[in-house]
Amino acid sequence: MTLLMCLLMSLLIFVRGCDSQFVDMSPASNTSECLESQVDAAAFSKLMWPYPIDPSKVDGIIYPLGRTYSNITLAYTGLFPLQGDLGSQYLYSVSHAVGHDGDPTKAYISNYSLLVNDFDNGFVVRIGAAANSTGTIVISPSVNTKIKKAYPAFILGSSLTNTSAGQPLYANYSLTIIPDGCGTVLHAFYCILKPRTVNRCPSGTGYVSYFIYETVHNDCQSTINRNASLNSFKSFFDLVNCTFFNSWDITADETKEWFGITQDTQGVHLYSSRKGDLYGGNMFRFATLPVYEGIKYYTVIPRSFRSKANKREAWAAFYVYKLHQLTYLLDFSVDGYIRRAIDCGHDDLSQLHCSYTSFEVDTGVYSVSSYEASATGTFIEQPNATECDFSPMLTGVAPQVYNFKRLVFSNCNYNLTKLLSLFAVDEFSCNGISPDSIARGCYSTLTVDYFAYPLSMKSYIRPGSAGNIPLYNYKQSFANPTCRVMASVLANVTITKPHAYGYISKCSRLTGANQDVETPLYINPGEYSICRDFSPGGFSEDGQVFKRTLTQFEGGGLLIGVGTRVPMTDNLQMSFIISVQYGTGTDSVCPMLDLGDSLTITNRLGKCVDYSLYGVTGRGVFQNCTAVGVKQQRFVYDSFDNLVGYYSDDGNYYCVRPCVSVPVSVIYDKSTNLHATLFGSVACEHVTTMMSQFSRLTQSNLRRRDSNIPLQTAVGCVIGLSNNSLVVSDCKLPLGQSLCAVPPVSTFRSYSASQFQLAVLNYTSPIVVTPINSSGFTAAIPTNFSFSVTQEYIETSIQKVTVDCKQYVCNGFTRCEKLLVEYGQFCSKINQALHGANLRQDESVYSLYSNIKTTSTQTLEYGLNGDFNLTLLQVPQIGGSSSSYRSAIEDLLFDKVTIADPGYMQGYDDCMKQGPQSARDLICAQYVSGYKVLPPLYDPNMEAAYTSSLLGSIAGAGWTAGLSSFAAIPFAQSMFYRLNGVGITQQVLSENQKLIANKFNQALGAMQTGFTTSNLAFSKVQDAVNANAQALSKLASELSNTFGAISSSISDILARLDTVEQDAQIDRLINGRLISLNAFVSQQLVRSETAARSAQLASDKVNECVKSQSKRNGFCGSGTHIVSFVVNAPNGFYFFHVGYVPTNYTNVTAAYGLCNNNNPPLCIAPIDGYFITNQTTTYSVDTEWYYTGSSFYKPEPITQANSRYVSSDVKFDKLENNLPPPLLENSTDVDFKDELEEFFKNVTSHGPNFAEISKINTTLLDLSDEMAMLQEVVKQLNDSYIDLKELGNYTYYNKWPWYVWLGFIAGLVALLLCVFFLLCCTGCGTSCLGKMKCKNCCDSYEEYDVEKIHVH
């Protein structure tokens, strides 16, 4: 029962008392002391190689868990590193060693064990970034060697303690991750780390730092010690009550990789890029460790490689990057890996890509996020608090710079104004915070370092200085916001002056046999120098030298210091370093400010201010209004828990409204990849270079902006735009209000090549256009006129509007936003619809200006032209000389070697077959280019013959007076001929190499041109195909859209109804507001379409009224049109139509034609007028007919000038020359498809968001030019055929010696005999050829009669 309870509890939390659940980590270390080490943090920090996070290279990305994607781009919210984050660099080094080939001694490490980092959301590690390159060794910077990859080691825990010397150690259970086995094993264990008490160990004397190490020449040889680092760690800590111990094997290589650690309720997760993406940055989870206690801190374990002095190697730095909850845009390849990424909150351009879920964005003006107006002041009402006590720094003797004093404050209110009033401030500079902010903010702690310091030396203490002050005396830390105050002490301050200013000008350690090796001892930020104890109060003389022998705990050697004395000034001059640390605790340090008019809101009514009202903080606009609510409660809230009213200490009641937020748009030009930022309808005085900008679509806050020069325009504040008074008539990036953004590559560029330019969009009238005559028809003809000017405004665009849907519906409440997620992509569709309306505006305005600027178009060419001979792509057949080959049996029975044959090997082989090979070698020599040549190979027979000849000539030389030396001539000739053969072969190879190089270069040039051309051609195909595929994919994805339901699956809806019911009230509110928002968007879409239609009308009026004289009555103003003028107006055009308007008319009797009585009759018709009767005569057969124009009554005789002959009974139609004959021929290049497009582009349908189908591209491709060029390139490739000189392969066979054949035959005979005896001489009844009987070895069996079976 006890065991059962123990197991049950272990599922919830590690039970410390269940011994059966612990892992045996024995053996424990039995070393009498820990290994000696030298901590030299300054040397390690000098070597810095920054590697910022680059999402485009997929740096540090953890692959989404439990799912995979293919060939898709999506925005994903998870744990990612910040783009551009430099991270923290860590470096390992080899240890000290004795002599050139001596064994290693003490370790050489940095102070990583003293650095405790916050774990937060976890981190990722870049490993081996510089592996395989050449670099320096930390311990010997002058030595360059190849860099190897080093794996990091970590301790992760939730609680800390300290050693007796104040150094941090991990308490309770800690997770330890250690690489081992010389980079082939990774250990992870969860234990209580109990410090050992022997010498140099954490609880012993002489402790400096814990670390792990491997002795390379012992642990990393043929047999790898898989526990070398683990055992070294055990020498510092006893591993107590370990709950698990896991190990993973690692393939040893020098490939760069990524490693990551996160934690959630399931435990600690480990990630690595080695699992599935070795040559990329994708990290996959490979282990989950049962660690459920929240990890708060981590420390990098120092590591030392104990190598001999002559075998030292450099080790690559690794980089740790913190993870944050961010939204990334991820691009998944076809094989499922992430190959591109964008940090959505990095800058405006990143938000643009993420807002539209695309890595490729076309040129345009896009809405990306919202921006809340910056506060213009502060309103504070708060209770009184206890003041921080600064009196210790105002009494006693002022300390020297190297012996500075420090005050740390918490849980009090400080009065910085009062403190600074006691000094004559000479300089007040800050880093990471402004002087005003540090005096007005609240912090978890406030630290003040102060010391006596002359103002004449203030340049030596500034950031970036490298003099003696920051090296040996005081180095300011910039880890937290900090300020530096340089001031003179006033006479009424009681602080005592020292005799003189003093500082350390040298602090070094002397080591070596003769103490001739000097190592400067630099200080780290916030640390004291080891030389400060020589003279804490100051130096008695300038250049005073001090020496002291260092203890073994201090690292040994001789400490030497030099002090410099500076004369004291009349008034004591001091330096104050104020550092603050932000936090969320209740023991905060807040300012006791001289609030001035911050206590009153009367001068800031109607403005956006930051307020702090008795602990309630926020940002809003205060207004006087009628009091509501209970006065004693001070605060009045609405049903959304928003502060809407406040009873102030001044007795007034103020309404509180939220500050105005404005839309943010990005102006983007694809050709230059430049962008600018537009803050709609806001003054630049409210916009800073890094404001609180938040995109609810990408859930990202902006962190960076490149440009910091705002420009005020009529449409809002723009950053990244310069004003050069440009006027353009064509605009691809309209901003509204007749403003345009011109990219820097434009012909209008005159100022900056790195910014957009602001231009005014203006219409310039053409010079002269000949009017087109036309006729009109009326029953009354004017007799008098007056001039009239008709003014007309046509709206061609509307103000672009974006709505933050989530903010409008939920007003920032998390519970509401979670329910709103159940409505699918409703909000995103709202934003898409509004963005579509904005794009429609841009298109209509661009079309308008293009139409009134030019009327010429260029026709498209359709189809593919030309024939393509694909056989040109075939590789030509290259033939060679025929070669004879031995049979398969011969290949089996002979040893062989294949060598290059320049052409003489076959003749040599045929000659050798005619007699004994050992005697015919020289006889069979071949001639090539006048040289005798032999193959560069000997068989055993020739080796024996030539060796015997050579030895015989040498041995007999003494007996024959050297005459026997002639026997060595065959050997010499053989060597000469064979060397000739080698030379001839090399010469042929060299010539062929030149031919190959020349032809290959020619082929490369042709291929380069060909691939470039094919890339241009196929990119057109890809654009067309991808555009259709993306549109169809978008259309198919709509099938899974919930369209406001909680799920697209009916079963899910039925299963989850009970969970929705509890949020019914909030759901009703969401429904009501979404309906209101939907109605607004619908109205906006109608207005947008109306403006687009009006833009077409404006285009027609420019072409007909401004460029020409219109004969249409009333189209270009009132009356008969004379001339029109047009000027720009907000969101449209303003027309001035000049015409004459009839004031009096006369009624006349008119006829459309006159005919006589001839047979056939002869008829005439008026030209641009009427035939009328004379009004002064009486109607009779003698009635006189006259002609008058249709626009002005002026009778005149009928002549050939104002009439024409026509045939009777035939209708006369006058066709204007600007109208094509209908249905005759398509002479205007406008076909039925174009007419449909002209119709449908002005028709908008809002069904279930199938608008994306309009983006399907049906463009016909014209690839004939590109394919023709490819034909020529392929011909050039075939021309690069390399006609090599014949250099075949020759296979030389070497027969086996006689004893091999003899053994081979004997084996065959033995095999045959074995078979014979097994088959013929075994078994009962055999006689072995009648020579042997075996009756005695056979048992007797009864014989049975067996019935015969007949098979028919």
From Swiss-Prot:
Residues 1319-1352 are cytoplasmic. Residues 21-356 form the BetaCoV S1-NTD domain. The chain crosses the membrane at residues 1298-1318. It is a single-pass type I membrane protein. Keywords: Coiled coil, Disulfide bond, Fusion of virus membrane with host endosomal membrane, Fusion of virus membrane with host membrane, Glycoprotein, Host cell membrane, Host membrane, Host-virus interaction, Lipoprotein, Membrane, Palmitate, Signal, Transmembrane, Transmembrane helix, Viral attachment to host cell, Viral envelope protein, Viral penetration into host cytoplasm, Virion, Virulence, Virus entry into host cell. Disulfide bonds join 191-242, 344-354, 388-412, 430-483, 442-590, 911-924. Its main location: virion. GO terms for biological process: endocytosis involved in viral entry into host cell; fusion of virus membrane with host endosome membrane; fusion of virus membrane with host plasma membrane; receptor-mediated virion attachment to host cell. Specific enzymatic cleavages in vivo yield mature proteins. The precursor is processed into S1 and S2 by host cell furin or another cellular protease to yield the mature S1 and S2 proteins. Additionally, a second cleavage leads to the release of a fusion peptide after viral attachment to host cell receptor. The cytoplasmic Cys-rich domain is palmitoylated. Spike glycoprotein is digested within host endosomes. Residues 386-592 form the BetaCoV S1-CTD domain. Residues 887-908 are annotated as: Fusion peptide 1. Gene3D superfamilies: 1.20.5.300, 2.20.210.30, 3.30.70.1840, Spike glycoprotein, N-terminal domain. Glycans are attached at residues 30, 71, 111, 132, 162, 172, 227, 241, 384, 415, 492, 624, 723, 762, 773, 784, 869, 1144, 1147, 1174, 1226, 1242, 1257, 1278, 1289. Residues 1022-1066, 1259-1287 form a coiled coil. InterPro entries: bCoV_S1_N, BETA_CORONA_SPIKE, CoV_S1_C, S2_sf_CoV, Spike_N_sf, Spike_S1_N_MERS-CoV-like, Spike_S1_RBD_bCoV, Spike_S1_RBD_HKU4-like. Residues 1247-1286 are annotated as: Heptad repeat 2. The record marks 749-750, 886-887 as: Cleavage. A motif (KxHxx) lies at residues 1350-1352. Residues 1-12 form the signal peptide. Residues 993-1043 are annotated as: Heptad repeat 1. Residues 906-928 are annotated as: Fusion peptide 2. Pfam families: bCoV_S1_N, bCoV_S1_RBD, CoV_S1_C, CoV_S2, CoV_S2_C. Fusion peptide 1 (FP1) and fusion peptide 2 (FP2) function cooperatively and have a membrane-ordering effect on lipid headgroups and shallow hydrophobic regions of target bilayers. They are considered as two domains of an extended, bipartite FP. The membrane-ordering activity is calcium-dependent and also dependent on correct folding, which is maintained by an internal disulfide bond in FP2. Belongs to the betacoronaviruses spike protein family. Homotrimer; each monomer consists of a S1 and a S2 subunit. The resulting peplomers protrude from the virus surface as spikes. This is Spike glycoprotein. It comes from Bat coronavirus HKU4. The gene is S.
